[in-house]
């Protein structure tokens, strides 16, 4: 009796997890307003975008720092 209850419980739990769909927000790029100089390392650009301009992330593209934000 308890084994059947556990089986039903885990079946419901498993089916509930299947219904959860993860969605990723689209990111849009924006040229960093206050980053100065050529961008050589993604780490420094990412740190600048997150901490100084409050964006999601940052990356170097064509020696310029681009910050990403949710569209």
Swiss-Prot record:
Source species, domain of life = Eukaryota
The disulfide bridges present are 28-71, 39-60, 45-65
Tell me the PROSITE patterns matching this sequence: GAMMA_THIONIN
In the record, biological process GO terms are:
defense response to fungus; killing of cells of another organism
Keyword annotations: Allergen, Antimicrobial, Defensin, Disulfide bond, Fungicide, Oxidation, Plant defense, Signal
Describe its function.
Answer: Probably has antifungal activity.
The name of this protein is Defensin 1
- Origin species: Arachis hypogaea
Q: What is the lineage of its organism?
A: Eukaryota, Viridiplantae, Streptophyta, Embryophyta, Tracheophyta
């Amino acid at each position: 009796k308890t084994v059947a209850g556990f089986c039903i419980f885990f079946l419901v739990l498993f089916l509930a997890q299947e219904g959860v769909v993860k969605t990723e927000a689209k990111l849009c790029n924006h040229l960093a307003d206050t980053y100065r100089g050529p961008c050589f390392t993604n780490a420094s650009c990412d740190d600048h975008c997150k901490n100084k301009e409050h964006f999601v992330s940052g990356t170097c593209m064509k020696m310029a720092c681009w910050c990403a934000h949710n569209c």
